């Protein structure tokens, strides 16, 4: 195995746990920080997702509702799917607080600077992660020594990435509705490979939010009607990115200097303290 050829030549056919371990090794060789496996069955969060959409919490993101049944059952996306390989890349540009780009680390921001979400300051994470996910997908047939039917997604298809990651043992979905990895925190970009390989499922990770309310209390627009439930129509990430019309007047004062997204509910999370990051390239010169 090498960086140029993470699979290696001449490896014998494998399946089950050895195949799962080989997939993990290839994923890490490609620069992925987390690799997990879940079975491709309807999510346990089906009822939650349907209720969330019915309550109008998805706002104008009609694409979520149009393919809702596919989102809750990966076999509707790829009928041959037996497993989901879920990967994560812990990446966030390390902005100096004085530059005004870090969501909540300092009150010493430059007065003329607006806040943008951490993930948006560098290269498009879709491209950065998708290249690695597709490389991992391309290795599957070689590892399994047979043609493998697979499809890869990085926030680009009808996949519930966080639910899949939770099922794959990458972490738990916290009170801020983000996936929290016990070692990497929640600034984790997720990718999913649906495939027809039968792989052992990972053990789940217990919810470690406990009695903490930091993410709920810091939200300037009260976007959490209850723990673990996000009303996207009140979230600054929605109103500054997804919403095509004017920002609702009741939310304008709370928006403050947020111009593209919001990280507050992640920045205050104890699980994000001193977590490793893979810096994205910075073509915009924001650092």
Where are each of the predicted segments found?
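SIR2/sirtuin NAD+-dependent deacylase catalytic core
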Residues: 211
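Auxiliary alpha/beta "docking" domains used to position bulky ligands
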Residues: 2-208, 247, 256
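A short, flexible beta-alpha/helix-coil linker loop
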Residues: 200, 241-242
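Short alpha-helical interface patches
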Residues: 156-163, 232-240
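Iron-sulfur cluster-binding cysteine motifs and their immediate structural context
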Residues: 32, 214-238, 244, 258-283
């Amino acid at each position: 195995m090498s960086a140029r050829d993470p699979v290696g030549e001449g490896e014998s056919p494998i399946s089950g746990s050895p195949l799962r371990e080989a997939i993990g090794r290839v994923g890490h060789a490609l620069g992925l920080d987390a690799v997990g496996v879940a079975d491709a069955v309807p999510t346990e969060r089906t009822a939650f997702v349907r209720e969330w959409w019915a309550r109008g919490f998805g706002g104008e993101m009609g694409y979520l509702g149009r393919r809702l049944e596919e989102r809750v059952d990966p076999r509707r996306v790829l009928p041959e799917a037996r497993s989901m390989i879920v990967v994560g890349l812990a990446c966030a540009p390390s902005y100096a607080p004085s530059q005004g780009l870090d969501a909540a680390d300092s009150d010493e921001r430059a007065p003329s600077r607006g806040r943008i979400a951490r993930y948006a300051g560098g290269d498009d994470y879709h491209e950065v992660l998708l290249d690695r996910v597709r490389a991992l997908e391309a290795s599957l047939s070689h590892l399994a020594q047979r043609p493998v039917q697979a499809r890869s997604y990085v926030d680009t298809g009808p996949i519930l990435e966080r639910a899949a990651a939770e099922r794959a043992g990458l972490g738990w979905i916290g009170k801020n509705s983000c996936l929290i990895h016990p070692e990497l925190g929640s600034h984790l970009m997720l990718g999913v490979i649906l495939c027809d390989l039968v792989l052992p499922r990972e053990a789940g990770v217990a919810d470690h939010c406990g009695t903490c309310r930091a993410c709920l209390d810091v939200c300037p627009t009260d976007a959490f009607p209850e723990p673990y439930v996000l009303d996207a129509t009140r979230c600054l990430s929605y109103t500054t990115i997804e919403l095509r019309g004017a920002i609702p007047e009741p939310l304008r004062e709370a928006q403050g200097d947020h111009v593209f997204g919001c990280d507050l509910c992640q920045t205050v999370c104890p699980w994000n303290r001193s977590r490793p990051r893979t810096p994205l390239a910075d073509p915009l010169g924001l650092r």
